[in-house]
Amino acid sequence: MPELTRRRALGAAAVVAAGVPLVALPAARADDRGHHTPEVPGNPAASGAPAAFDEIYKGRRIQGRTVTDGGGHHGGGHGGDGHGGGHHGGGYAVFVDGVELHVMRNADGSWISVVSHYEPVDTPRAAARAAVDELQGARLLPFPSN
């Protein structure tokens, strides 16, 4: 039996470390309920869009759902001038007590809102909950369109 050397130990560790991301990758494709979604064109969950939600959190109704391009805020673009187009949340809208909470999906897949802009979270549901926590009972005011 060959003697265990530092070189062989480091080589074995590198092989194991290289395999870990391959095992973790399929888990990253699960939606909010932990179920894997089929890769079907037009399926919002398959394209990375989070699942819709509608719940009462700390006495506030929070909702989230996908939106179509025609239903974007600000008349289809930033300030109604056609610039930007659609939601910053990549076709996803979040509401607190019926008032839209502006959310944005970051390049790394995390989400931020206009209320908790410097605290990224994993899902729009978590962004809505963080906003309710930050509001501390105050009413969410509509975001100005210009």
Swiss-Prot record:
Transmembrane segments: none annotated. Residues 69-85 have a biased composition (Gly residues). InterPro entries: GriE/MELC1_sf (IPR023199), MelC1 (IPR010928), TAT_signal (IPR006311). Keywords: Copper, Melanin biosynthesis, Signal. It holds the Pfam family MelC1. Predicted to be exported by the Tat system. The position of the signal peptide cleavage has not been experimentally proven. GO terms for biological process: melanin biosynthetic process. Residues 65-85 are annotated as: Disordered. One of its GO terms (molecular function) is copper ion binding. It comes from the Bacteria. Residues 1-30 form the signal peptide. Belongs to the melC1 family. This protein may function to deliver copper to tyrosinase. NCBIfam families: TyroCdyMelC1. This is Tyrosinase cofactor. It comes from Streptomyces antibioticus.
